């Protein structure tokens, strides 16, 4: 349970978490146009583009795992500084070494630094009492950043794109004090009077003490208490199955955004029209965010999510017979809508 005086509840922590999350996810947001840049400006083949994109996004995942391992053991501000230095250095190195082999390695390292950076940002947002609202802010802002990237990046050289990514990390150093240095200790969840009231020799367990303290805080802060769930009835394999399903889902999403613009070029669709569609489709994510919130409030999470994943697969399947303007338009709009729907 989070103390009302928690540093994570300050607006500065919210602002830092949102900015860092947006910067950390910037490559993912712009991957369709970045993939095209690797192909057209660096003359990478389509398989090479896929491997470079996979290295970048794979590094993002690896970095997030590293952040999860060290976030409770190290000062978070130190992790932010290290990740900023790594991201800036590797993006600048990409402007100097542009062979396929060098780019493959450097994009993995850049993705890893970005993953640590983003992991700290997400942990900062997730530690708030109303973390759902914080992530809704993130999804809302992400739509505008995604649109901006898809509009401006195609107008830049490859080196300029790398430099923009490098520079975007630097403001985090100026707002470093806004990032809480440590997480919330579990001991802080117990109200000072709770243990004394129960008595030192009381038969209540520590879990019961935390439950009572949590109820007291909920009543004081106006937070609706959530009934305790008996996790012993959930098989240990279920969380791992859920994580595996999430990983596979995002591998497919990453692959889609990596190749969709390249596929449109192979289908001889007008490049300017495709670019405009990719820009405006970003704003469709806002509708996805709103609809997902309304549906989840009414019908819960599991059934809408399962149905959405099935529709997601069917939407991509409409491109199997071939790609024309109508199919491309319908596919990218529905895909982006459902992608954000799944996130929410």
Range-by-range predicted roles:
Residues 106-140:
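Cytoplasmic helix-loop-helix junction between adjacent transmembrane helices
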Residues 101-110, 326-335:
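Paired small-residue
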Residues 137-184:
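Helix-loop-helix hairpin linking two adjacent transmembrane segments in secondary transporters
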Residues 51-60, 275-285, 335:
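Transmembrane alpha-helical segments of major facilitator superfamily
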Residues 43, 96-101, 300, 321-323:
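Helix-breaking motifs and short loop linkers at transmembrane-helix boundaries and internal kinks
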Residues 63-76, 288-301:
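Helix-to-loop junctions at the C-terminal end of transmembrane segments
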Residues 78-92, 303-318:
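Structural signature of the two symmetry-related core transmembrane helices
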Residues 31-32, 237-279:
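Extracytoplasmic gate region of multi-pass secondary transporters
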């Amino acid at each position: 349970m989070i103390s009302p005086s928690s540093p994570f509840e300050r607006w500065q922590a919210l602002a830092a978490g949102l900015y860092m999350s947006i910067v950390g996810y910037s490559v993912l947001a712009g991957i369709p146009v970045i993939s095209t840049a690797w192909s057209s400006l660096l003359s990478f083949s389509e398989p090479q583009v896929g491997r470079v994109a996979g290295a970048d996004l794979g590094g993002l995942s690896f970095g997030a795992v590293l952040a999860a391992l060290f976030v409770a053991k190290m000062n978070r501000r130190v992790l932010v500084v290290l990740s900023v230095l790594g991201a800036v250095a590797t993006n600048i190195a990409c402007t100097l070494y542009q062979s396929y082999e060098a780019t493959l390695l450097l994009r993995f390292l850049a993705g890893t630094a970005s993953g640590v950076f983003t992991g700290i940002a997400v942990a900062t947002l997730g530690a708030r009492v109303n973390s759902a609202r914080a992530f809704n802010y993130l999804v809302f802002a992400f739509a505008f950043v995604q649109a901006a990237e898809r509009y401006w990046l195609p107008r830049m050289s490859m080196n300029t794109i790398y430099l923009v990514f490098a520079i975007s990390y630097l403001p985090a150093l100026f707002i470093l004090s806004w990032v809480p240095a440590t997480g919330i200790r579990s001991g802080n969840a117990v109200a000072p009077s709770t243990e004394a009231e129960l008595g030192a020799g009381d038969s209540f367990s520590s879990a019961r003490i935390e439950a009572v303290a949590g109820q007291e805080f909920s009543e004081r802060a106006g937070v609706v208490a959530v009934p305790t769930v008996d996790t012993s009835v959930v098989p240990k394999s279920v969380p791992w199955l859920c994580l595996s399903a999430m990983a596979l889902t995002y591998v497919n999403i990453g692959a889609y955004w990596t190749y969709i613009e390249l596929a449109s070029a192979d289908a001889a669709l007008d490049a300017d029209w495709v670019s405009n569609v990719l820009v405006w489709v970003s704003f469709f994510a806002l509708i996805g965010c709103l609809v997902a919130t309304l549906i989840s409030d009414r019908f819960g999470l599991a059934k809408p999510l399962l149905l959405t994943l099935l529709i997601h697969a069917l939407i991509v399947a409409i491109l199997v017979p071939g790609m024309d303007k109508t199919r491309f338009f319908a596919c990218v709009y529905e895909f982006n809508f459902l992608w954000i729907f799944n996130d929410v």
